[in-house]
Amino acid sequence: PKPNGFLVLDEVPPAIHLWLLSTGTGLGPFLSILNTPEPWQRFQRVVLVHAVRTADELAYRRTIARIAEAEPKRFAYIPFLSREAADYALAGRIPQAIGDGRLEARAGLGLDAALAHVMLCGNPAMVADATAALAARGFRKHKRKEPGQISMETYW
């Protein structure tokens, strides 16, 4: 069966960079996307962000490591931990890291509405707050009749 809805690459307008921002189990749809040829054919850089409470909740580490090994110059993985600290992860929450620039700094890539498309999947509060943080930077929700730079799905 062919995936449908808005959280599929068929619905993403042309962009140079693809940012995939997830919390918890919202990571799943993005791994499905990353395990196809399409993102690597369409985008110069892909950034996968996964936010959870503790390191034990960081899922699919082998799958993500395999993607990073296959696309070392084009793929960045940024884990977030909200309830404990680790050198390899950003602390706190995704929307705040968008606002204060930590997300871009860790990715080594600017979050620019002229170049990027952002897909959000996960906790409804993260989706809403990240959408607001991105809107403050000129990003708009993508609609079929009004192309924008943000696609989203709450996944709780």
State where each predicted segment sits.
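Extended, folded domain segments that form the structural surfaces/walls around functional sites
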Residues: 31, 47-50
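FAD-binding FR-type
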Residues: 1-19, 36, 82, 137, ...
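Conserved S-adenosyl-L-methionine
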Residues: 15, 38-46
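Reductase modules of NAD(P)H-dependent flavoproteins
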Residues: 49, 54-156
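Ser/Thr-glycine-rich phosphate-binding loops at phosphate-binding pockets of nucleotides
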Residues: 23-29
